[in-house]
């Protein structure tokens, strides 16, 4: 990215931090044209399906989804059921589903940050840590946490599911927001493959099945 684009994104992320987290940061002066560009990026980010706490989100990969269902069922019947931990898992799955089908959801990442700031202290991270291992999603949770650290001013200590920071997480988000790829393709996010191999396999399995189902005999 050139310096102009970097300034636009710096101010975009600063304005989002102020709006959603109350973090005031000094923004660089920008021309009206640059602010229009920032507004266009913001509008694109807001076009995604928003996270809803009333919805249940699912994995693209069937194996991961079966494991998620088992985890949720076992937790709901546990003596020490942690609703906050289940809710965190739901937000994480929403973000993973969106990343695997379309691309990074900035509103989804913001929702994750808001949840951690408001209810993170009530989450049982011993349980959550075991779930991330069972579901093979630690690279994905690290990507989400890295975006929060690099764009929203979070400290790594606020995000226990950050197992290894992704150095170029901010750049990946910026590239996605600037891309023009179409919904439902992995063309704009092939670099995400290393974060979710199971998800990519599940995505293409579903796409092939849909194509076969649509073939007229």
Where would I find each of the regions flagged by the language model?
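Conserved NTP-donor binding/palm subdomain of two-metal-ion nucleotidyltransferases/polymerases, i.e.
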Residues: 1-217
């Amino acid at each position: 990215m050139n310096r102009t684009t970097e300034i636009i994104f710096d101010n975009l992320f600063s304005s989002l931090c102020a709006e959603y987290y109350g973090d005031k940061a000094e923004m660089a002066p920008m021309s009206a044209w640059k602010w229009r560009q920032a507004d266009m990026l913001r509008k694109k980010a807001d076009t995604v399906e928003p996270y809803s706490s009333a919805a249940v989100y699912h994995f693209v990969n069937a194996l991961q989804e079966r494991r998620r269902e088992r985890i949720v069922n076992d937790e709901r019947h546990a003596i020490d059921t942690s609703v906050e931990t289940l809710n965190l898992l739901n937000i994480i799955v929403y973000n993973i589903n969106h990343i695997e089908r379309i691309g990074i959801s900035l509103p989804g990442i913001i929702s994750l940050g808001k949840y951690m700031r408001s209810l993170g202290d009530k989450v049982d991270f011993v349980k959550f840590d075991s779930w991330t291992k069972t579901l093979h999603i630690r690279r994905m949770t690290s990507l989400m946490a890295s975006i929060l650290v690099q764009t929203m001013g979070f400290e790594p200590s606020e995000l226990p599911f950050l197992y290894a920071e992704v150095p170029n997480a901010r750049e990946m988000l910026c590239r996605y927001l600037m891309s023009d790829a179409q919904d439902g393709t992995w063309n704009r996010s092939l670099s995400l493959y290393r974060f979710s191999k199971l998800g990519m396999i599940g995505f293409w399995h579903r796409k092939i099945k849909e194509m076969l189902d649509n073939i007229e005999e």
